């Protein structure tokens, strides 16, 4: 299987996860909860809906705030994390609601934003 980091990834919110099963995605959300095992956490998107992120290994660092996750959507509509990035909010606040609006537009107009979608000629 090709490395997921090399594949095009659709930007999605929590409601869109069931449409992307077995496909690579990028999910951005606010950390709500970390499972006690450290192998799963919950992110809320710009609509306040939750997405579950699964990890291969337990977290080895403290995470908080806004997190961008790249991974593959599982059959349970969770994201199996390949990598994550913490957004630093020291100087600028990340507007998750505005980001969510952009994600919806990108998905509503695939002819203008084709990244992560199969191309049909």
Swiss-Prot record:
CDD domains: RPA3 (cd04479). GO terms for biological process: base-excision repair; DNA replication; double-strand break repair via homologous recombination; mismatch repair; nucleotide-excision repair; regulation of cell population proliferation; regulation of mitotic cell cycle. Keywords: DNA damage, DNA recombination, DNA repair, DNA replication, Isopeptide bond, Nucleus, Ubl conjugation. There is a cross-link at residues 39, 88 (Glycyl lysine isopeptide (Lys-Gly) (interchain with G-Cter in ubiquitin)). It is found in: Nucleus. Gene3D superfamilies: Nucleic acid-binding proteins. As part of the heterotrimeric replication protein A complex (RPA/RP-A), binds and stabilizes single-stranded DNA intermediates, that form during DNA replication or upon DNA stress. It prevents their reannealing and in parallel, recruits and activates different proteins and complexes involved in DNA metabolism. Thereby, it plays an essential role both in DNA replication and the cellular response to DNA damage. In the cellular response to DNA damage, the RPA complex controls DNA repair and DNA damage checkpoint activation. PANTHER family: REPLICATION PROTEIN A 14 KDA SUBUNIT (PTHR15114:SF1), REPLICATION PROTEIN A3 (PTHR15114). Component of the canonical replication protein A complex (RPA), a heterotrimer composed of RPA1, RPA2 and RPA3. Also a component of the aRPA, the alternative replication protein A complex, a trimeric complex similar to the replication protein A complex/RPA but where RPA1 and RPA3 are associated with RPA4 instead of RPA2. This is Replication protein A 14 kDa subunit. The lineage of its organism: Eukaryota, Metazoa, Chordata, Craniata, Vertebrata. The gene is Rpa3.
